[in-house]
């Protein structure tokens, strides 16, 4: 029996504690909150895309505030420079040498707010940090502290003053989610209660960074059967043959799908993945990685195509 099987109750308790803590700030969005926590535990990064005012930043801040760790927020603007993210080397005349001054990327959780308002050059400065979990300044590599997660928010690209994220950067995000507008009951609770800013000020951490790292280790140990791995490869191969898709899913996408499946299984108290885990996370993991043919560039089309792939690819039969 693996560690996660032996401590499934403890894992689920910690997971639910974090989700519940965030839900005290972000009302009526439990599914989105669970995805955010799963992204952290799968050692991935999260992209939250939606219109202004629906709680993107509040969700990111609440996740960071629910963990006893370091976190930084960067407001992306057109004049933001790469050095504003990674840091700079400062010459100290007293000892005649350069000293590295770390930028805000040197935190466990980094909130990149409105990432698509910065220039492509600045957006690209995130790539090494997100992929390699280290950055290079003046030829020297600096390792980022674990756990490390980037939570980026962006407004729809149709809005004025936004830059479309390149495919290479989108591919670095494990999950992309949208919060959407709250339901009527949830919006009434928002009106009746405190504002998110007030709730964030009193929010207390419910897990330590050491507990998060232990949960990350448990997620890594979730078992994926060969038949389930074949099922995920079948989905990727089907995307490469689809007539509406210009560029199908890469092997990296399949790896990211497997990571999300492990996190989803662990969050539900299991030490093994199932096809239902694949179906639960597929849209959030895969839709932003598809490059559609001309005339099929709406986000909803990408979501629908992932659902179509899931419907068309046979599910492995348990034996």
Region locations from a protein language model:
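C-terminal engagement/docking regions of AAA+ P-loop ATPases
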Residues: 1-5, 9, 241-319
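Pre-Walker A (pre-P-loop) alpha-helix and adjacent loop at the N terminus of AAA/AAA+ ATPase modules
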Residues: 8-54
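Conserved alpha-helical scaffold flanking the Walker A/P-loop in AAA+ ATPase domains
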Residues: 34-38, 91-111, 140
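Walker A/P-loop
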Residues: 37-77
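Walker B catalytic acidic pair
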Residues: 50, 113-114, 125
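P-loop (Walker A) phosphate-binding loop of NTP-binding proteins
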Residues: 51, 85, 153
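AAA+/P-loop NTPase substrate/partner-engagement loops
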Residues: 66-94
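Canonical AAA+ ATPase core
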Residues: 92-97, 118, 122, 130-221, ...
């Amino acid at each position: 029996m693996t560690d996660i099987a032996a401590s499934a109750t403890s894992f689920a308790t910690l997971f639910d504690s974090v989700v519940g803590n965030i839900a005290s700030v972000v009302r009526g969005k439990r599914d989105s909150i669970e995805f955010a926590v799963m992204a952290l535990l799968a050692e991935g990064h999260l992209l939250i895309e939606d219109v202004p005012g629906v709680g993107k930043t509040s969700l990111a801040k609440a996740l960071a505030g629910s963990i006893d760790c370091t976190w930084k927020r960067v407001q992306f603007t057109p004049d933001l420079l790469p050095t504003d993210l990674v840091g700079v080397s400062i010459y100290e005349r007293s000892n005649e040498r350069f000293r590295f001054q770390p930028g805000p990327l040197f935190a466990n959780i980094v909130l990149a707010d409105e990432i698509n308002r910065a220039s492509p050059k600045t957006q690209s400065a995130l790539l090494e940090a997100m992929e390699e979990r280290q950055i290079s300044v003046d030829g020297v590599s600096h390792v980022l502290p674990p756990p490390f997660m980037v939570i980026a928010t962006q407004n729809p690209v149709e809005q004025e003053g936004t830059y479309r994220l390149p495919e290479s950067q989108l591919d670095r995000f494990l999950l992309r989610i949208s919060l959407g507008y709250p339901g009527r009951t949830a919006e009434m609770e928002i009106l009746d209660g405190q504002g998110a800013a007030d709730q964030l000020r009193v929010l207390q951490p419910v897990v330590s960074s050491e507990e998060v790292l232990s949960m990350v280790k448990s997620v890594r140990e979730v078992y994926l059967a060969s038949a389930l791995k074949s099922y995920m490869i079948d989905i990727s191969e089907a995307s490469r043959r689809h007539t509406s898709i210009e560029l199908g899913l890469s092997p990296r996408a399949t790896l990211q799908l497997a990571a999300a499946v492990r996190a989803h299984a662990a969050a539900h108290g299991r030490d093994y993945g199932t096809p239902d885990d694949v179906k639960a996370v597929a849209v959030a993991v895969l839709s932003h990685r598809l490059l559609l043919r001309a005339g099929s560039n709406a986000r909803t089309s990408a979501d629908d195509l992932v659902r179509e792939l899931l419907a068309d690819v046979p599910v492995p039969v348990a034996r």
